[in-house]
Amino acid sequence: MIKTTLLFFATALCEIIGCFLPWLWLKRNASIWLLLPAGISLALFVWLLTLHPAASGRVYAAYGGVYVCTALMWLRVVDGVKLTLYDWTGALIALCGMLIIVAGWGRT
């Protein structure tokens, strides 16, 4: 389960970076060249999703819980926004959902 969770976090980071770089280009007039690493990051994101041994819908559902947590870490570290009790509570609930789904992978 730890390996799966770490893989999900790596996957989420690739997705967030792949979306953040075009956002910088569009919103902050950054270089159009940011689209190249963004595309690579998104391709890596898709490839990482294929490494899980479950049906794609289950992988996407479980991944969503980790994505929420990773996005909140990004909010804190990159955007510099302090997390609220609601952020922490939502992240905990999302992570619990992911753990429940992953725990059932070998039982179906």
Swiss-Prot record:
Pfam families assigned: UPF0060 (PF02694)
Intrachain S-S bonds: none
Principal place of residence: membrane
Subcellular location: Cell inner membrane
Keyword Transmembrane helix: yes
InterPro entries: UPF0060 (IPR003844)
GO cellular component: plasma membrane
Entry keyword Cell membrane: yes
Periplasmic-facing ranges: 1-5, 52-60, 106-108
Superkingdom, taxonomy of origin: Bacteria
Ranges facing Cytoplasmic side: 27-30, 82-84
UniProt keyword annotations, A-Z: Cell inner membrane, Cell membrane, Membrane, Transmembrane, Transmembrane helix
Transmembrane segments: 6-26, 31-51, 61-81, 85-105
Membrane topology: Multi-pass membrane protein
PANTHER family: UPF0060 MEMBRANE PROTEIN YNFA (PTHR36116:SF1)
Family that this chain belongs to: Belongs to the UPF0060 family.
Protein name: UPF0060 membrane protein YnfA
Native organism: Escherichia coli (strain K12)
